Amino acid sequence: MSKQRKKADLATVLRKSWYHLRLSVRHPTRVPTWDAIVLTAASPEQAELYDWQLRRAKRMGRIASSTVTLAVPDPDGKRIGSGAATLNAIYALARHYEKLGFDLGPEMEVANGACKWVRFISAKHVLMLHAGGDSKRVPWANPMGKVFLPLPYLAADDPDGPVPLLFDHILAIASCARQAFQDQGGLFIMTGDVLPCFDAFKMTLPEDAASIVTVPITLDIASNHGVIVTSKSESLAESYTVSLVNDLLQKPTVEDLVKKDAILHDGRTLLDTGIISARGRAWSDLVALGCSCQPMILELIGSKKEMSLYEDLVAAWVPSRHDWLRTRPLGELLVNSLGRQKMYSYCTYDLQFLHFGTSSEVLDHLSGDASGIVGRRHLCSIPATTVSDIAASSVILSSEIAPGVSIGEDSLIYDSTVSGAVQIGSQSIVVGIHIPSEDLGTPESFRFMLPDRHCLWEVPLVGHKGRVIVYCGLHDNPKNSIHKDGTFCGKPLEKVLFDLGIEESDLWSSYVAQDRCLWNAKLFPILTYSEMLKLASWLMGLDDSRNKEKIKLWRSSQRVSLEELHGSINFPEMCNGSSNHQADLAGGIAKACMNYGMLGRNLSQLCHEILQKESLGLEICKNFLDQCPKFQEQNSKILPKSRAYQVEVDLLRACGDEAKAIELEHKVWGAVAEETASAVRYGFREHLLESSGKSHSENHISHPDRVFQPRRTKVELPVRVDFVGGWSDTPPWSLERAGYVLNMAITLEGSLPIGTIIETTNQMGISIQDDAGNELHIEDPISIKTPFEVNDPFRLVKSALLVTGIVQENFVDSTGLAIKTWANVPRGSGLGTSSILAAAVVKGLLQISNGDESNENIARLVLVLEQLMGTGGGWQDQIGGLYPGIKFTSSFPGIPMRLQVVPLLASPQLISELEQRLLVVFTGQVRLAHQVLHKVVTRYLQRDNLLISSIKRLTELAKSGREALMNCEVDEVGDIMSEAWRLHQELDPYCSNEFVDKLFEFSQPYSSGFKLVGAGGGGFSLILAKDAEKAKELRQRLEEHAEFDVKVYNWSICI
């Protein structure tokens, strides 16, 4: 596989996974999510940090509110091994549920391994991440926990959102694996220092068994890792295979692999990825063991032994390993408790393994194949290029950089404040540093420099007011002995000490020679900030090495080692400092947006971050709220009122004033209606509100004939189905940005289903009748006024009378009108029925009054009509019904808004193929478009970046769909429909439901693509079959299937 292909695959897998994660968090009843997420930690203090991070993830929408989260430390901070930690975590989860009030009876104590508790936990779907321990090779990540290090993949998709972390991406990948468990409870285990990029949607897990994810790997890599030996059922033609596990090997030689028959026919072997699952009975057995594991763990601690997950615990599911396992600590118990079930290998051939085991690997993942999806600037404050020197390839996240700073290529700066007179080299990592400019003096007196390939970070310590500054070389391995390749800042540690005049006894008083290494060297002084920076320069070899003053200061100072630091981190202080720092950054960005910008940022999201400062944050939000009237006044000519009002609504909510926010929302929607009217017909608002008979409309009837003349008009129109592009036609998007929609006019069951008959009558007033038997006679047409009642069945016709000017222009002074309407399609169809019926009525009224009945004029008037009705909506429905055939329509903002309809000259072959392969299916699910529409428009007015990027993508797909249809590439149209459907669910997860999901899942083997038409939520669906035969087969299966009470309609393109 080429590097280019890998990069594309990584982006595709991550985007799909993130889409699914967001969907499962926003609508967990429809898209199942984890019942519990559990992290293992090395100590109670680290567990507190992880709990804080888990709360953050919930607050940021990474974890569903219904999911139980828990961080579980090793007992008393003693190392017990990953296998025992797994059992301990299961026990802790059961106890946690007990504390949450899940009372299963007075005699039911978890510690007794009670059957009811085992049954209760066994029904749960649990994600477990092993994230405990120290990270000697990525020491700067120890304070935050390596699993929470920053990984800004796809960060640009949501520039006002939090910086994505490795943990967030792991959650995204894992969210797709949840479907493999279906309704059977289970456990899914991952490790905290690896991001396994693969399409977990495809994952298959055998029932009542354990499984391990594997990937084919070359023998040289396999020799340093775990290898899985399976039964010979691999078929490399498939993207994955499921096979019974026969044996487990640890760091095998080539001879071992040959002897155990572990080499595949292509010369590779199966790597153990560390992703393990247990489902059904295998999970129940594990829960039963976990609920009664405490005596076993005490025995391990007493004997100072460990139980590994990857060697010991999984061996219980592999019969060939049982004899070996019985020789291990508690091995007999594992075999007896778990050995009844089997383990399978789920081998996925396209898995990419991003390992974060060293600092250099972290930087590699930001500058290598994946660099195209890396957000290099996120939630940061950066000076102008004329007063700083910051490399374009550097990654700056949640940081404030002052003028006068220099940052080299491919460096990572995270959660820091870097003041002037600081120079950071290339390929360096700076984390949690807050350099106060007043401590540095002038650049002439002292300029701090961090050389190339170095790491620099700060740690708050328990029992100390200040922080300690820590540093090392990017490639230093703190585990290496001083006498065996041990380095500091990239140089041999022995030589560094000799050059500086430091004795080994200064660093190690209680360690024997072979155990002396950077990890346990008491190297880092705790002094004032400026003293620590100056000594850092000296220790890194940037200063006079034999400076007596500095070595004296260093020797006399209290010093700590990396090891001691790891056990003394003040986690609450660190979390609080990080929250305040990010709140300050968000506040600065929001302030700049209001003072210098046009409210282009998502202030709702930024305020969410600002409020982490609690009372201080609330004051900041109140100050922003106070600025709103002045801001609106200054920018009234160029800032849409709808956006200005929405900002005020968001700030009222941030300040806790929900009542005022709800009250102001009416102004938001009023402004959208007003802006729409202004854009589609210049001067329309004045025309609508004018009480005199004088008209400013194009449809002005200058001399209405007072003598009654009988006239009758009948308008019949098709319905529309949309392939892609919907939402880009909807105000206020279409008033501010270009919109593109690809749709098609069709007949149903051989007829045009939507129509109206309008005729003049001798009886004064207006009579309205619909196909539901509702009738109304309006004696005085001037009495028709907005707003209309939501449940008024005649508000569509009343709005049509207003927008066409029939009432205002005295047309009904000399004649009465009888209006009859019908729509022979199910209610809530999604076929644009309401808009197309409105178009039919508007067209009929303009015909009978000699108005401008051009399709473009009608389309614009219907836009205004829908705003008057309060339903909102865009132009694509009326365009779809008014213009025949398949068309690609563009809209361009302006006053008036410009519409450009381009009919696609479809060949007879294309028409025939579409009519044979495309199924138009009524789902039977009633939908209300305005409910979906309200949510989507609100998110757009908030400048929700994920929504904006989704609609932009829909417009790009509309252009691609046009090309595909013109080239008769119908399969590609199916792919486009399916991606459009995913994006629609990104816009609003409630645009689908479980029934629709099941319908599409059932149709998947027969189809190239599918989607609900219109805004979704129910109504009609389009299913593009793989070919004509598959279409016939699917139609028959759907009509016969008892679970699906759906109707497949006969249709044809309305030419």
Curated annotation (Swiss-Prot):
Organism, scientific name: Arabidopsis thaliana
Binding site for ATP: 826-836
UniProt note: phenotype after gene disruption: No visible phenotype and no alteration of the sugar composition of cell wall polysaccharides, but accumulation of free L-fucose.
Known tissue expression: Ubiquitous. Highest expression in flower buds.
Enzyme's top EC category: transferase
Keywords, ordered alphabetically: ATP-binding, Carbohydrate metabolism, Kinase, Magnesium, Manganese, Metal-binding, Multifunctional enzyme, Nucleotide-binding, Transferase
UniProt note: pH dependence: Optimum pH is 10.5 for the L-fucokinase activity and 6.5-8 for the GDP-fucose pyrophosphorylase activity.
The protein's name: Bifunctional fucokinase/GDP-fucose pyrophosphorylase
Coiled coil: none
Annotated InterPro entries: GDP_fucose_pyrophosphorylase, GHMP_Kinase-Related, GHMP_kinase_C_dom, GHMP_kinase_C_sf, GHMP_kinase_N_dom, Ribosomal_Su5_D2-typ_SF
Thermal properties: Optimum temperature is 40 degrees Celsius for the L-fucokinase activity and 30-45 degrees Celsius for the GDP-fucose pyrophosphorylase activity.
Biological function: Bifunctional enzyme involved in the salvage pathway which converts free L-fucose to GDP-L-fucose. Catalyzes two successive reactions, the ATP-dependent phosphorylation of L-fucose to L-fucose 1-phosphate, and its guanylylation to GDP-L-fucose. The sugar-1-kinase activity has a strict substrate specificity for L-fucose and ATP. The pyrophosphorylase activity has a strict substrate specificity for L-fucose 1-phosphate and GTP.
Family (UniProt): Belongs to the GHMP kinase family.
Molecular function per GO: ATP binding; fucokinase activity; fucose-1-phosphate guanylyltransferase activity; metal ion binding
Pfam families, per the entry: Fucose_pyrophosphorylase, GHMP_kinases_C, GHMP_kinases_N
Keyword Glycoprotein among UniProt keywords: no
One of the GO BP terms on file: GDP-L-fucose salvage
Superkingdom of this protein's organism: Eukaryota
Reaction catalysis annotation: L-fucose + ATP = beta-L-fucose 1-phosphate + ADP + H(+); beta-L-fucose 1-phosphate + GTP + H(+) = GDP-beta-L-fucose + diphosphate
Sequence segments annotated as region (L-fucokinase): 693-1055
Span list, region GDP-fucose pyrophosphorylase: 34-565
Cofactors, names only: Mn(2+); Mg(2+)
The enzyme's E.C. designation: 2.7.7.30, 2.7.1.52
Free-text cofactor note: The L-fucokinase activity absolutely requires divalent cations such as Mn(2+) and Mg(2+). The GDP-fucose pyrophosphorylase activity also requires divalent cations, with a high preference for Mg(2+).
